Amino acid sequence: MSEPRKILVTSALPYANGSIHLGHMLEYIQTDMWVRFQKHRGNQCIYVCADDAHGSAIMLRAEKEGITPEQLIDNVKAEHSADFADFLVDFDNFHSTHSDENRELSSMIYTRLRDAGHIATRSVTQYFDPEKKMFLADRFIKGTCPKCAAEDQYGDNCEKCGATYAPTDLKNPKSAISGTTPVLKDSKHFFFDLPAFDAMLKSWTRSGTLQDAVANKIAEWLDSGLQQWDISRDAPYFGFEIPDEPGKYFYVWLDAPIGYMASFKNLCARRPDLDFDAYWGKGATTELYHFIGKDIVNFHALFWPAMLEGAGLRTPTGINVHGYLTVNGQKMSKSRGTFIKARTYLDHLPPEYLRYYYASKLGRGVDDLDLNFEDFVQKVNSDLIGKVVNIASRCAGFIHKGNAGVMGEANAAPELTDAFLAAAPSIADAYEARDFARAMRETMALADRANAYIAEKAPWALAKQEGKQDEVQAVCSLGINLFRQLVIFLKPVLPNLAADAEKFLNVEPLTWEDHKTLLGNHQLNPFSALMTRIDPLKVEAMAAASKEDLTATDATASSAPAGNGELAKDPLSAEIDFDAFAAVDLRVALILKAEHVEGADKLLRLTLDIGDEQRNVFSGIKSAYPNPSELEGRLTMMIANLKPRKMRFGISEGMVMAAGPGGEEIYLLSPDSGAKPGQRIK
């Protein structure tokens, strides 16, 4: 028998500035299932995480609430910990990036990078709030759009007309924090020399550490050229001060991934069997895996391994990337009741129903996963209750009634138990590959065979026939053994069901190896319901509890003609003559490439094909399209004769057209099918 593997696993750190929602839970449930599977097979698998507890947003929220940042992050950590525990996410340690371990490790890594010549400095010009005495990120600057004159717009884009611009282009800029007029000020910033690791990253990202689709996307970024990464922020800032640089702080994304190391180091202090260097030292033979969403791939597949390499530490064995969660086919929405907090779900439904549903739809790719309420109810009721639990509920009563709860010795259908045994390696391979959907399909196929066998033998009919009691016991004993096998295969996904089944089966906690054996002449405990069907009304109640209170916009709306209120919120502009309209050259454009803009909170960089030429356009639609690659290959509409605008990120050569109030509700416009790039819109 081979030696148990030694594995360290992390999930992305939740930000300590808000509640956990079902989109977050997709990642933590996925990771937890994989970790439980490894432990189920006898491997030493350690799962650590932490709250991401630094940054201006936390500092400002704490100030607004009249508490210290430390009090805020402590409160949020307690909430997060309770949500994770109740969703059966079993961390070996859940820590905080605001910790002594993280301060020590962040300083150590920075110092090693600095001493190796991988840190550069240069002056950066930014808006500065003279009242709060702090530099302002783009999202903390508001003013009048230089294009359409809309007021109260952010520092890098207009949510009304979609224009993008540099913060210095904004008219009447104001600090969103204090309301004062900001001033431009220079400051020394510190940069990590990421381009120095270009060759290392090109090799590492193609070494099997990433899914192919992710490696291909990373290759695009590498081919376009890496830039030095700004790793500093100025005081006041809630975080760690940079060694030997008073008033300068590590940017949150520098110390956040180091939080993985810090959480593990904190655990090592309580676990003498764990050696920190055996997991993080250069040349470590243990395994290290990060589970993350596709929105933070650049930090984990570029910055993080380069930092580790530059600091003389090991790099990850693998980075497992997943897609986003949609609900009923759309992005989560508070108004539709589909932006569901973890606690709201738990107030209405058991956690294992969602764990199973996620598992049934999670492949090893980076595709988005849709939580469809109707499908959710049907799948849980059909698979878990109608197939798995149904086997035990059908068979247990006959064994208790006919044989005092003692299972028979004989195997009534060896060919069936052999099929279950033969399926185990494939199910294990699916778990290992994080293809949970395949593991669930193959397990449910076995459940179908078990139910078909029981239905064919019909012990309820046999029990009424004289002289058939031994056959009833044999059929039902086999049914209980098949149920036990299914529980073994499902235990990483459904730990509570497994625990309740173990009590009923009167056995020690089941391990993966137990699938190779059968129970015989074995005493069962009395059976009680292991799961109940989902009532669709509970799902409706959960959605209702998630809806924001909507305020009526017009007291007389009930008697007015039907309308959606959009014109009231955004009145029509003044009339223009035809010549003014004709001067605008609208064209169909094909999105060749869409990508995040480093340092911009709201912008995407779009490369557009308009027939005979390509254009580079910056668009403030990031909040609605967090996965920009999904836009690639799509047709849209653009203003092609808009004067190019110089921005701090580059030149924007036009404007794409979108509708919506802003935030997540921005809808990029597309022409009807058949339109071609470059065609005029008229």
From Swiss-Prot:
Enzyme kind, highest EC tier? ligase
Asked if the Swiss-Prot or TrEMBL record annotates the protein with the keyword Cytoplasm, the reply is yes
Residue window of motif 'KMSKS' region = 331-335
Q: What are this entry's molecular-function GO terms?
A: ATP binding; metal ion binding; methionine-tRNA ligase activity; tRNA binding
Cofactor(s) needed by this chain: Zn(2+)
Gene Ontology cellular-component terms for this entry are: cytosol
| Cystine connections | none
The cellular location(s) given in this protein's UniProt record come to: Cytoplasm
Name of the protein described by the UniProt record: Methionine--tRNA ligase
User: Per the UniProt entry, what species is this protein from, by scientific name?
Assistant: Pseudomonas savastanoi pv. phaseolicola (strain 1448A / Race 6) (Pseudomonas syringae pv. phaseolicola (strain 1448A / Race 6))
What is the name of the gene encoding this protein?
Answer: metG
